């Protein structure tokens, strides 16, 4: 039971005006109440929870509770003098504390905060309504932060891509799979790929789901998904013979990655069916520095095609011509 401290015990709780002692024997009987201004204390039965407070507290703000006290809103008062309000009493203590202090700590749970907002709107407490709305907005702003999931298993990845309604960009980055030393620029290019992934994640936050895979087979590989299927792939690693030894080379095909990221936006908001035909017709794809190949089922199998772009293919030492340092094999 909620109670408000008072200076004198001489105050009296509101009762039905004109009721005789004999009428109080009818338990549960309700009668329309009159103005409560003449009373100092009010007993409230809010959805089964009992609260004891003063008319002064209820009248602090221009609200439904004030109109109940001054008689402009008719209420029911039972035979024991309780003002009956047909509302959930779970958050009514919070409502009373707001009236007493002008502010009140709000629940951490968003669901409970929305419940308090509903009660504040019902009682027409504009101060509490604004307090709830501003707190909800702040929490939503925090929740809008950029979150990039880290893949922990192949099943998790498949489920995430299949159920996501947004386009998906995945960066596979597993340096543990490297068997050879890196070329001189590979470390820098690897960091550039990671930095670009972070920048794109911030730039397209809310429109594209960016996920990172550190358990896959590739050292550095971008994959692009739309409507639950892979649309394109950009592999940034290759094996080269630079000093009579195999070395791992990591490239940074920035323009190609940007292009594929923009292409994948065609699948945003369920617009994939039209975008699919456009992508497969080559209308939005331009030739890059690397080699591009498509996997599919030929005619009639266009829906299964995946554009795989390899910036550099494998380079064989025994295929280098005289005086040449590098030979590319397609």
From Swiss-Prot:
Q: Where is this region: Disordered?
A: 1-34, 282-304
Domain (BTB) ranges? 40-108
GO cellular component term, pick one: nucleus
Leader sequence residues: none
- Family listed: Belongs to the BACURD family.
- What is the designated name of this protein? BTB/POZ domain-containing adapter for CUL3-mediated RhoA degradation protein 1
Q: Which UniProt keywords apply?
A: Nucleus, Ubl conjugation pathway
What species is given as this protein's source? Answer: Danio rerio (Zebrafish)
Protein function: Substrate-specific adapter of a BCR (BTB-CUL3-RBX1) E3 ubiquitin-protein ligase complex required for synaptic transmission. The BCR(KCTD13) E3 ubiquitin ligase complex mediates the ubiquitination of RHOA, leading to its degradation by the proteasome, thereby regulating the actin cytoskeleton and promoting synaptic transmission.
GN (gene name)? kctd13
Q: Any keyword Ligase?
A: no
Q: Give the GO terms filed under biological process for this record.
A: brain development; central nervous system projection neuron axonogenesis; head development; negative regulation of Rho protein signal transduction; neural precursor cell proliferation; positive regulation of apoptotic process; proteasome-mediated ubiquitin-dependent protein catabolic process; protein homooligomerization
UniProt cross-references to InterPro entries, sorted A to Z: BACURD1-3, BTB/POZ_dom, SKP1/BTB/POZ_sf, T1-type_BTB
Describe the disruption phenotype.
Increased levels of RHOA. N ochange in brain size or neural progenitor cell proliferation is observed.
């Amino acid at each position: 039971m909620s109670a408000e401290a008072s200076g004198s015990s001489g105050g009296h709780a509101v009762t039905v005006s004109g009721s005789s002692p004999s009428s109080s024997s009818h338990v549960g009987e309700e009668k329309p109440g009159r103005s409560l201004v003449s009373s100092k204390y009010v007993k409230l039965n809010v959805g089964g929870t009992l609260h004891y407070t003063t008319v002064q507290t209820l009248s602090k703000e221009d609200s439904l509770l004030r109109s109940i006290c001054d008689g402009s809103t008719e209420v029911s008062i039972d035979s024991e003098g309780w003002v009956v309000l047909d509302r959930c009493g779970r958050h009514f203590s919070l409502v009373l504390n707001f009236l007493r202090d002008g502010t009140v700590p709000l629940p951490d749970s968003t669901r409970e905060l929305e419940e308090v907002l509903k009660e504040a709107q019902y009682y027409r407490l504009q101060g509490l309504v604004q307090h709830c709305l501003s707190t909800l907005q702040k929490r939503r702003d925090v929740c809008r932060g950029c979150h990039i999931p880290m893949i922990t298993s192949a099943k998790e990845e498949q489920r995430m891509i299949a159920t996501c309604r947004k386009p998906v960009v995945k960066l596979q980055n597993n340096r543990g799979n490297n068997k050879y030393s890196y070329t001189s620029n590979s470390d820098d290019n690897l960091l550039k790929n990671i930095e670009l992934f972070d920048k794109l994640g911030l730039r397209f936050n809310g429109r594209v789901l960016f996920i990172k895979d550190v358990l896959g087979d590739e050292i550095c590989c971008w994959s692009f998904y739309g409507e639950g299927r892979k649309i394109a792939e950009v592999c940034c690693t290759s094996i080269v013979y630079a000093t009579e030894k195999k070395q791992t080379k990591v490239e940074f095909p920035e323009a190609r990655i940007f292009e594929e990221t923009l292409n994948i936006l065609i699948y945003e908001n369920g617009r994939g069916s039209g975008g699919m035909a456009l992508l497969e017709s080559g209308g939005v794809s331009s030739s890059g520095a690397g080699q591009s190949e498509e996997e599919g089922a030929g005619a009639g199998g266009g829906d299964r095609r995946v554009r795989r772009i390899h910036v550099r293919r494998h380079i064989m030492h025994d295929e280098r011509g005289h005086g040449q340092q590098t030979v590319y094999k397609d």
